[in-house]
Structures are given as structure tokens and as C-alpha cells.
Amino acid sequence: MNVRLKRAKELVGYAVQLTKDEGLPTMVKRGAGFVKRRCFGKRARYLPAKKVLEAQRAEMAGKTAADCGLPTISVLTPLYNTPEKYLREFLDSFVGQTAPNGQLCLADASDAAHGNVERIVKEYQQKNQQIVYKKIENQGIAANTNAAAQLATGEYLALADHDDILAPHALYTMGKAILQLRQRGEPDGFLYSDEALFTKSIRRPMVAHFKPDYAPDYLLCCNYICHLAVFQKALWEQLGGERPECDGSQDHDLFLRLLEKTGGAAHVPQVLYYWRVHAGSTSGGADAKPYVAAAAKKALADHLTRTGRTGTVEDGLFPSTYRVKWDIVGEPKVSILIPNKDHTEDLEKCLHSIWTKTGWEHFEVIVVENNSTDPATFAYYKKAQQRYDGLRVVTYPKKGFNFSGINNFGRKYATGEYLLLLNNDVEVRSGEWLTELLRQCAHPGGAAVCGAMLWYPDETIQHAGVITGLGGYAGHSHKYKKAGGSGYMFRTATVQDFSAVTGACLLVKTSVWDEVKGLDEAFAVAFNDVDFCLRVRDAGYRIAWTPYAQLTHYESKSRGGDEKDPVKARRFAAEQQRLYEVHGKANILHDPYYNPNLTMDREDFSESDDLRGLKEGRITVQWRE
């Protein structure tokens, strides 16, 4: 079938399905956005407007690296048999920077048949004295990069491949971001930006990688940082540069070692780097360079050793992803709290799956009875306690439903070092679910809270982490996405850092629960889990989510919202307002583990229809530990 015809049929099918799932108004809005981007906004959509670039050039007119007021950034680029077209485009991107605060350090290991590489570079040196060049013997990518670093005189270093392109405002933006960090008194040792992939022209990019702020668990699963990374030269020298034994994943290894020194990184949500996709490039996938995986696993294993943590590094669910199976310290007991009102069929399915599928043996289950009215429920409780050794049923003394109050009451009876909040309409799928949740928490430097992958019965995602700000308040990552995919930038296939996870399945250290005083009972139904996780985060702890703990959540996709009942609608609105009051609207709307260039209207990680931050060249930077 003709490729264009096939694509057209796919788009029509998508439009029909979207209309069925979300209604005609949503389909029309999405369609209008698609047409706008495709026909009018596709070109150069990640570049600042022409007037913004001109203003930057005017600001820097007549200035040099020494007097422009920005820290000098030396870009390290090893050359090896670089095709002329790619080389010229790369050099043009450096020469065309809007600020003069750059130095380009080229270490050329090209063979004798590619003497034109040196000739082309020398041609460009006539245009720009900030280009320095050295001919070297080829010793591999890490050693060649180290050779380029020996030419550097800048306070900062950056890494760029010889076939890629720097955005015209890359060095200006990074220089300004460093100054912002200094003005705020924040660490400025390591920064990174967003990037885009392209084939022919950066004015027609394929896709952007809009990254979260520094996310340590995510980085252990894949090198999401990539380009453009900028770091202090002094740190590079302390580390001894890149390690040849990690060739193929030398940058990932470097970033891990840098972070051991800095304790965190700063993220600039601007597309400052264009990564060319072609045969043989890592942007085209791990299959292009098979040795990458072995090098990455070595880098990760060495990082664990250096940081005093123990675990096994394995291949992840998809190429270019990895999994750290942390060693659990001790044999911690988990107290599973399950609120229940009638619905004994759901509860039995839940309990049966726990006792028949859970590999971790050290747990207790506490069912918190909440105002059941069916006599059969109490008969079931007696039978269940005989059937399931260690099951206890305790009775919540207050009337009405208050999820927070019920779980706070259940905690009084818990004896475990960890608490697990679990809905009664959840069924265990994988035997290692509880073990995996503990792996993320019960090791030195682990998270305080961890959530699981929850599936609807039709094998679409119900929960893969919570993003604050979606829809104005909070939403679930990749909700309704079908099984089999990896999500945006592998985010449903790798352990993730999140601001919150759902209380339908939430593991937390009991000591942390007690420290933040449990759930806030002012959030009776909605946002209690979000509020809890944000308070845990504010106390200095991390929230993790893992795809390796899998459960089915029988929550109905078509369940009606609280807006249909006036009383419930008022309660829901009050809880929404309280979320803003407690945590601040600005904080809710800016989730550090999301990206301002992604949509706030949907849960699918699609690109925002509003990219004004990019078009205006808006410089914001956030440092995070």
C-alpha cells in the first residue's frame, strides 16, 4: 500500500476512535491542533522566533567570549570520517551561535582517506578563531573526547557529536541559565536541556525529547539526559574525563560520575540540541550500535559500587533501557491496609490474589471495615479470617466515607515497617509485585513511597504515576494507553521519579507516614494521595513508580464523576481548592517530573499546543537533587 495512503487511513481511524472515546468536541480540538502544527507550525517549531534570535545577537554585538558577560563553554567534539554535509552543518551551527561565549574543541581521528575533514575545519577556523583543532590517532570515542578536552579553555564543557547540530541559541541560553543559578545561590555544576531528533533539517524535526527535571531513578534506567549537557571543567578534571572502558555509553557513565559529585542537576526546558537520525547513530536505536548495552550496564554497576549500594543490573523491558534489581535490606514486614464496605466479591478476589501470588512472605493484611450494611459481608469476614492466615478485620468507628480517615485508623493496628495502601478492587498480577515495591524503598538511598503499574481489565493503563497540574489539578501518566508500548521516552517501561502515585496501591515507609502525620482527613475522597505524596516530597523524600509491580484495577472507565451529584460536586470542588491552598497553585501546575512543553489537557504526554516558551526563548532553569 502507498505509504501516504496508509498513513491517511491510520489518521482517519484514529479520528474515529478519538471521537468514540472522548467525543466530537475533543476530536475537533485535537484535529485543529494537528492541522495547525502540520501545515502552519511544523517548521522550526522548537526554535525561537526570528526577532528573539536577532535580539540576542544585538545584545552580544561587538562582544567577545572575554567580555560578553557569559561563562565560556567549550564544546568537545571528536571527529571521525565525518561526511562533509554533516560536518559543515555542525560547524555552521557553532559559527552561527547568537552569543560569542563558545569554544569548539575538535579532535580529529579520521583516517587517511578522509583528509577533507581537516581541510574543511581549517576553512572554518578562518571564520571563527574560537574553533581549535588537533589531529589525533583514533583510540575510541572516550579517549578522543578526552583529547578534545585538552584543548578546552572554557570554564564549562559541553558534549556534541560531529554529525549533530547546535540550536542557534544554545550557548547563549546555557550561559544565561548558569547566571540565573548563581544569582539564586544554587549549584551550577551540571545542566542539561531538551533535544529534538531530525533527519534532514532542524526546521522539520521528527520529535522532541521534552525531559523532566533531574530524575535519579529514571537515569538509572536509561540515559534520558543525553544532549545538551553542560558541566564545569573543574569537575571533568577531578573525574579524569571519560572512561574508555565505557565506550558506547561513555556519556551515561560520565553523567553518573558527575552526579556523584554535584548531588543534582539543573534542567533548562529549551530545545538546544538537534540529534541527527541516520544508520549507525545511537539516536536511531540501540540496534545501530549493539555494544552500547554492555557498556551501559558496566557504567551502572560501577556507579552502584561507588555509591555503596548493592543490586543487579539487567536489561530492561526495551532496548536502551536497564533495570536495577536492588538488594532489599533485611526482611521488612509490610502491613497491607484495605478499606472495605460490602463488595465482598471484589475483596475476595483481592485477598485471594495476595495470598496465592505474592512472593514476599513477610506481610499482614488489615481490612478496615467501613459501615457495611449487608449481613453477608460480616459472615464473609469470619470465613476470610479462617481462610487467610494473618488476616485481621478492624472496624472504622465513624460514619460516612473518608478514605484518609479510614487508612489513618488502619495504621493504628499496623505492625509492619512499611504500609501498603490497597484498594479492595485491585487484583495482583505478578508474583514479585510486593518484592519489587520494596526493592525501590528498602535499600540505602531508596524512595520513601513507591507506586505500581495498574491496568484496567481491558489491558489499558489505569495508573503509571501521577502528574500534578494535568487538567488543572492532577492526572495519571499514560492513562488508557494499550499494553505493549514503552510510553513517552520509555516512561512506562522504566522506574520513574514522580511527584505522586495513586493511593490505590501505594507503599510507604511507616516511619515516613508517621513523620508527615498520615493522610489529611480534609481530603475525604479526592487528592488525598496527591497531598500525601507532596508532603512526603516536601519533607525531603523521593516518590518512585515501577513497571515491574503489576496489578489489575477494576475501577470502571465509565464511572461517573462527582459533578453529577451536587453534594459530591461541592465536596470535590472544596478538595480541589484545598490542594491549591496547601501546596500553592503554581507548585501544583509545575510538576518537576513533567515538562512545560507537554500538554496539560491530556494524560498522553503529547506535545502542548502552546509552545510560546520555546518561541520566546524563555530561559528558566530548575536545579534539583
Where are these regions (language model features)?
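Short beta-strand-to-loop acidic/aromatic patch adjacent to the donor-nucleotide binding site
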Residues: 154-165, 416-429
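Glycine-rich, basic loop-to-helix element that forms the pyrophosphate-binding segment
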Residues: 136-152, 396-414
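A short, conserved alpha-helix in the catalytic core of glycosyltransferases
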Residues: 235, 245-271, 300, 433-437, ...
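C-terminal, non-catalytic tails of nucleotide-sugar-dependent glycosyltransferases
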Residues: 2, 6, 13-68, 289-331, ...
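A conserved acidic beta->alpha catalytic loop
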Residues: 108-119, 369-380, 427
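Nucleotide-sugar donor-binding/catalytic module of glycosyltransferases
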Residues: 40-288, 302
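Conserved donor NDP-sugar-binding/catalytic core segment of glycosyltransferases
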Residues: 169-205, 426-473
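Short, acidic, metal-binding catalytic loop of nucleotide-sugar glycosyltransferases
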Residues: 92-101, 352-362
